Amino acid sequence: MTQMDDAKNGIITEEMKIVAEKEKIDIEKLRKLIAKGYVVILKNVNRDTNPVGIGQSLRTKVNANIGTSPDCVDIELEIKKAKIAEKYGADAVMDLSTGGNLEEIRKAIMDAVKIPIGTVPIYEVGKLAREKYGRVIDMNEDLMFKVIEKQAKEGVDFMTLHCGITKQSVERLKRSGRIMGVVSRGGAFLTAYILYHNEENPLYKNFDYLLDILKEHDVTISLGDGMRPGCLADNTDRAQIEELITLGELVERCREKGVQCMVEGPGHIPINYIETNIRLQKSLCKNAPFYVLGPIVTDIAPGYDHITAAIGGALAGYYGADFLCYVTPSEHLRLPTIEDVKEGVIATKIAAQAADVAKGNKLAWEKETEMAYARKNHDWEKQFELAIDKEKARKMREEIPSKEEKACSICGDYCALLMVEELGKR
């Protein structure tokens, strides 16, 4: 039984109770949202995960991507990244490793943190195919499903699977006139497979079998957007929307099977198209939780893409995106460092909080109100406690202190709050 099955049957699970308490939402309302597929709870039955709820009426959640590459394989470094992501408030981590012993790396990360862990199984499939047959495109159906089942048994909580890439969508891509083609790595693996073998995507062709595997372990499927645009110039084009229509159909099949699902989205979107993208997804995918990468709102800021993504993420969250995948300062440039991971998580947490405030979330507003009173009362310890980055706030205040203990060194004796307070005492 999955969380969705239980919810449909009127059963309130321990995981639902935990999420309801965290989110301060009525448990019966939460159960109904899960039954409809509007909320998912990330929690594999085989792993001792702290369950996380994502979707309608809940706070906007944040994911951090980590993982090795063929050029940089350091398990201890990835463990540190996972821990720093968890420390600064990431709600989930995805292990996107492509270098080294992927099973060993994945298990080490899963042991290091309690938050949900996601993967993109096709990466391991491609790596194994290359090692066994010489090329990624020589992967086969049997290998794909063996890897997916193995990861499900290991305890992976959610998986990105690019089931919406089809022979038809690849043909439409060819005619699209895109500048950048396919920029999703998993999407590229499957597009190349279709083009080379002239066969349908096995994940689409055997979707019911895939759902049977995921259902057994209550793995949430994150329907990947392999046709997402890789630049603003390609945004919201026919190839992207073709895939989204297919994903909407697959959402309905997930719900019929009782498998929890969410849908992934772009990517690179100009600000004036963010609302359009969110509304399209929510309509076509029947209010399935929406998981967006950023989105980045300008392509000319390499080194600062945590900022471009936070701008887009705040707007996307406000318009209805439920899950924001962070972007680090090193995006498009190199593998992220520990500091990059920290900066990416913090920037995206800021975006999520801004979105939740705009949506009127009670928990978000409680924090804002507490901070207002802490500043009014010159309660610096409370301000540090409420800060998204507590250490940085404390460090910056201590670097250039004020002679006036209650004030900061921007105003010192001329602190506006103190001045009016003194006059008010007369």
Swiss-Prot record:
Positions contributing to Zn(2+) binding: H268, H332
Q: In which pathway does it act?
A: Cofactor biosynthesis; thiamine diphosphate biosynthesis
Cofactor mode of binding and number, as noted: Binds 1 [4Fe-4S] cluster per subunit. The cluster is coordinated with 3 cysteines and an exchangeable S-adenosyl-L-methionine.
EC assignment: the record states 4.1.99.17
Please list the reactions this protein catalyses.
5-amino-1-(5-phospho-beta-D-ribosyl)imidazole + S-adenosyl-L-methionine = 4-amino-2-methyl-5-(phosphooxymethyl)pyrimidine + CO + 5'-deoxyadenosine + formate + L-methionine + 3 H(+)
- Give the highest taxon in the source lineage: Archaea
Keywords assigned? 4Fe-4S, Iron, Iron-sulfur, Lyase, Metal-binding, S-adenosyl-L-methionine, Thiamine biosynthesis, Zinc
Return the Pfam families for the record. Answer: ThiC_Rad_SAM
Q: What class of enzyme is it?
A: lyase
Q: What does this protein do?
A: Catalyzes the synthesis of the hydroxymethylpyrimidine phosphate (HMP-P) moiety of thiamine from aminoimidazole ribotide (AIR) in a radical S-adenosyl-L-methionine (SAM)-dependent reaction.
Question: Which protein family is named in the record?
Answer: Belongs to the ThiC family.
Name of the protein this chain belongs to: Phosphomethylpyrimidine synthase
Please report the organism this UniProt entry assigns to the protein.
Answer: Methanocaldococcus jannaschii (strain ATCC 43067 / DSM 2661 / JAL-1 / JCM 10045 / NBRC 100440)
Gene name on record?
Answer: thiC
